[in-house]
């Protein structure tokens, strides 16, 4: 009997996300039985719940993992029991694994970006990069750029809040 994995995406205004289709397609390719749910905290049925309450409910409901997106990538850090060193260095998580009560955080944004930039512009100059945006994903891309060998990184953000 194949184990069924219950996973989801937590965020706001994510009803049109392509993430569920991407994950379901990959699960089929790997022969995994997957159920991927959207947990949009702007949904009227969920809007009163905090991220911590959603995480507790996900644990009770048997979720194996949650992808975390805006605006919870940094908020989620407060709920982790353990995390990778990259989560601590980036200051954000985009993946929460729930093996029982030991809630663990990972950040795959940085490694995905590093792979993509290495594949798409491997010979780009790395002396100076100006990055616009410093939120949860922005921190991950900045981290990846430094790992890639950028010697001077200027980060700016138009969000004044």
Where are the predicted features?
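Phosphate/diphosphate ligand-binding glycine-rich loop within oxidoreductases
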Residues: 2-121
